[in-house]
Structure formats: C-alpha cells, structure tokens
From Swiss-Prot:
Molecular function in Gene Ontology: G protein-coupled photoreceptor activity
Record family assignment: Belongs to the G-protein coupled receptor 1 family. Opsin subfamily.
Alphabetical UniProt keywords: Chromophore, Disulfide bond, G-protein coupled receptor, Glycoprotein, Membrane, Phosphoprotein, Photoreceptor protein, Receptor, Retinal protein, Sensory transduction, Transducer, Transmembrane, Transmembrane helix, Vision
Pfam families registered for this protein in UniProt: 7tm_1, Rhodopsin_N
The organism of origin for this protein: Oryzias latipes (Japanese rice fish)
Descriptive protein name: Green-sensitive opsin
Length: 345
C-alpha cells in the first residue's frame, strides 16, 4: 500500500521506502513512536490493572458474600465485572509487556490469542451495557406491563452477551478477517487495514460496525432516552414531591453518565477504525490509532465505577468487605438501594 507496509500477519502504517519497517513480531517498533511513548502507554495499562482488577474482582467477592446482592437484576453487573477481568488479565498484562519491549514479541499465535480475548471481553462488556439498558427500560417504562424479572430472564440476558461477543470475536479465528497488531504494534485487534486475500475483511468490518456498534448505540440511546422521558413525566405529575424530583434528577444524571461512558469508550475507536477502512491507503500515524484503541480499554475501569460503585447497595457491601464502612441496614436505605438497582443504579 502507498502509505503503509503489509507483511505476513501484520500491517505497518509506514511505507517501507524509508527502509525502517520491520516485523512487529521480531523487532522494536521505535520508528513508529519514541521509546518513552511506549513506556507511557505501558504505565497507563499498569494503572488500569491496579484499579480495574480490584474493582471488578471485589464485585464478584461481595456478590458471593452478600445474598441480598444475588438478585436477578444484578446478574448483568456481575457479568460486566467478569468481562472487565477478562480484559485486564488476558489483554492488559500482555500489552504492558509489549510496551516495555517495544514490539509484540509473542508472535502471530500470541497476537491471535490476545486479540481474541481482548475482543471477547470488550464485546461482553459492550453487550452487557445493552442488556442492562434494556432491563432498566422494561422495569421502568413497563412496555410489557407488570413484567417480573426472574433469574431465568437475567441468565438469558447474560448468555445473550456471550453469544453476541462470540459472534464478533470468533470469526477472525476461523478465517473471516484475522487478528493483527494495531497502532504502535503492541496490542492486537481485527484487521481493519488490509484487503488480504482470503480473509474477506471488507464484509467483516461492515458486519462488525453495523451489528456490534451501530445496533448497541441505537439501543442504548433509545432505552435510556425513553427511561428519562418516563421518569420526567412521573415527576411532572408529582411536582410537590421533593423525593420524586430528586429521584428524577438522579436518574437523569445516571443515564447521562452511562451514555457518556459508553460513547467515550467506543466512539473514538470505532470511528477511527471505520475511517481507516473506508479511506484505505490514506496516511495515518500509528499513534493516532493507538490512542483510541488504548482509551477503549479504559472501559474496564470506568464501567464498574459508573454501574457498580455508584450503586449504593454494591458500594456499601464493598466498603464493609474492605473494612472501610458498615452496611446501611435500616429499611429505608435498603429500599432505596433496591430501587436504584432496578432503575438508575
């Protein structure tokens, strides 16, 4: 390609007329970015591990320890924490090492494994947010009447996230697209960059962008938008109720944070990947792709902060577990927490 160099199982966004391009599996890629930039990204990933792992792991611990957290509407939050742990353990650790040495030293097979696990975890996380939005929409807006969520419904929602995630992460393993190093060549993802014969990258990227980005975006905007409208309508009917007005503001704030968190994680990465795909051959720097790629990994940290730590019931249990606070046992607080779980937590 005019502005890049395609090799076996890799694509470097630099023309080899420079004579600098080397395999990202064998040589440091310091011609793509300064060594300190590699180290800085490695430090950033280390920060995500130090913060993301404890929060996600603690979510599983407190759920196992506290029966009151093991209610159907919380299943998807546990699923979200599992997705975060997959990203941290199987993606971030490998990425840190690659940043420190300056290239993806684990080879094509390691790249495929890392790319698959990172994509799987990221997609489970993404679809968990979709299922969570739908659950809240059903509970608050009641499009199905007085529908009662059971453990079976919630388990089906969790299973759905893994099915959808697998439908995105598995195809590159079996020849529909492939996993290659991206950005500064220290982490791996689907091939948005090349028209490599036999991989049908064009159809895969279009499928991934439409089904695994546009559909979730539309669903989340529709459900949370409907939720806010419903709560505002209820608040308008009870203008004299201070508690109702406060609840309306809280729900609006939480919905805003949820949508904002989703957009910050996925829009930069998906948009830039789409631009690369639809402007194939156009010049772009490795770092310009690395930044949105690395930023999307932040979802392993701020998703549990938004969806779990801001949930009073989970937060109280976590504080009690680490010895920094007691559970709020009075009936009013528990009732408030349960309402938060089903509406705006």
């Amino acid at each position: 390609m005019e502005n890049g160099t395609e090799g076996k199982n890799f694509y470097i966004p630099m023309n080899n007329r420079t004579g600098l391009v080397r395999s990202p599996y064998e040589y440091p890629q310091y011609y793509l970015a300064d060594p300190w930039q590699f180290k800085l990204l490695g430090i950033y990933m280390f920060f995500l591990i130090l913060t993301g792992f404890p929060i996600n792991a603690l979510t599983l611990v407190v759920t196992a320890q506290n029966k009151k957290l093991r209610q159907p509407l919380n299943f998807i939050l546990v699923n979200l924490a599992v997705a975060g742990l997959i990203m941290v353990c199987f993606g971030f650790t490998v990425c840190i090492y690659s940043c420190m040495v300056g290239y993806f030293s684990l080879g094509p097979l390691g790249c495929t494994i890392e790319g698959f696990m990172a994509t799987l975890g990221g997609q489970v996380s993404l679809w968990s947010l979709v299922v969570l939005a739908i659950e809240r929409y059903i509970v608050v807006c009641k499009p199905m009447g007085s529908f009662k969520f059971t453990a079976t419904h919630s388990a089906a929602g969790c299973a759905f996230t893994w099915i959808m995630a697998s439908s995105c992460a598995v195809p590159p393993l079996v020849g529909w697209s492939r996993y290659i190093p991206e950005g500064i060549q220290v982490s791996c993802g689907p091939d948005y960059y090349t028209l490599a014969p036999g991989f049908n990258n064009e159809s895969f990227v279009m499928y991934m962008f439409s089904c695994h980005f546009c559909v979730p975006v539309f669903t989340i905007f529709f459900t949370y938008g409907s939720l806010v409208m419903t709560v505002k309508a209820a608040a308008a009917q009870q203008q004299d109720s201070a508690s109702t007005q406060k609840a309306e503001k809280e729900v609006t704030r939480m919905c805003f944070l949820m949508v904002l968190g989703f957009l910050l994680a996925w829009v930069p990465y998906a948009s830039y990947a789409a631009w690369i795909f639809f402007n194939r051959g156009a010049a772009f720097s490795a770092m310009s792709m690395a930044i949105p790629s690395f930023f999307s990994k932040s979802s392993a940290l701020f998703n549990p902060i938004i969806y779990i730590l801001l949930n009073k019931q989970f937060r109280n249990c976590m504080l009690a577990t680490i010895g920094m606070g007691g559970m709020v046992e009075d009936e009013t607080s528990v009732s408030t927490s349960k309402t938060e779980v089903s509406t705006a937590a």
